[in-house]
Amino acid sequence: MDRDGEGDLADALWMTSTDYLTPTTLSLVRLDGDGELLAVEPLKAAPAFFDAEGLVAEQHFATSDDGTRVPYFVVRREDLALDGTAPTLLYGYGGFEISLTPGYSGGLGRAWLSRGGVYVVANIRGGGEYGPAWHQAALKGNRHRAYEDFAAVARDLVARGITSPQHLGVQGGSNGGLLTGNMLTQYPELFGAVVVQVPLLDMERYHLLLAGASWVAEYGDPEDPAELEQLLRFSPYHLFDAGRTYPPVLFTTSTKDDRVHPGHARKLAARMLEAGKDVTSYENIEGGHGGAATNAQAAHMAALAYTFLWGRLT
């Protein structure tokens, strides 16, 4: 870049970009004197780890219970038959003003997309996709809005013919594990399999374990009777009903998680197993909140989730 405004690169800029189907790419963007785009010249890209030919990424909107339009991304084969049979993985987070934006994952591409699976990312309230107001709309007693948004996306996928409940799985970790824990306990009829990773699940005691006290502003204070009542409405451990039918569930956690205590996953898995439900639980003895200490362990944890979901959704 010519900082003096003269020379061949005076009206040019460097741009780094990525999406679900494109590895991170550095490009030179050339502009005319009025700032209008002349050309985008890709210069260097990270390696591709799967064949994206014939795959497309698109954005749709679902309507939540209160009428809010909720955006979500779908990555699928361009020639996908809309007959409701595609194994579909729905991912979400919905908390702490964190935005889920498009990004490239070689593991996802090789393990899921290349096999004909559909991948969906829901940009539900609680996240930061539309700024602070989008986050604040799902704080504390309004947490139900995040879960209603996610369920609305699940229903919209079925309505579009992309998938059906028996072929639709969900995955989320940490706050996203609380999300998928609520999908498991509040909306079991919408899903064929659920993956709950390093989750919060006991919202009555979360503030007493590890970093839990630092999240009171997000979820609510269990020591306040009014807020505890609200917390119990989205506490999967307390919402579990032994007499209800649930989809197969995989819990994953880490013994050395220093943020969300592994006891959350342990106690709901134990309660469900005692009730005779279809539960798989895996606890890595290394790694922190990410669940793995090495790349090999991370690959193993990812493979566990993809294998579990593929085996139950196809």
Model-based region annotation:
Residues 81-87, 91-130:
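Short substrate-entry loop that stabilizes the transition state in hydrolases
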Residues 26, 62, 72, 90, ...:
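Conserved hydrophobic/aromatic pocket- or pore-lining residues that grip, position, or stack substrates
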Residues 1-81, 98, 107-110, 114-115, ...:
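Non-catalytic accessory segments flanking enzyme active sites
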Residues 56, 68, 86, 164-166, ...:
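Exposed loop/turn and edge beta-strand positions of beta-sandwich/beta-sheet ligand-binding modules
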Residues 18, 91-95, 174, 254-257:
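Glycine-rich His-Gly loop
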Residues 121-314:
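Active-site-proximal cap/loop segments of hydrolase catalytic domains
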Residues 10, 23, 83-85, 165, ...:
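Short secondary-structure junction motifs
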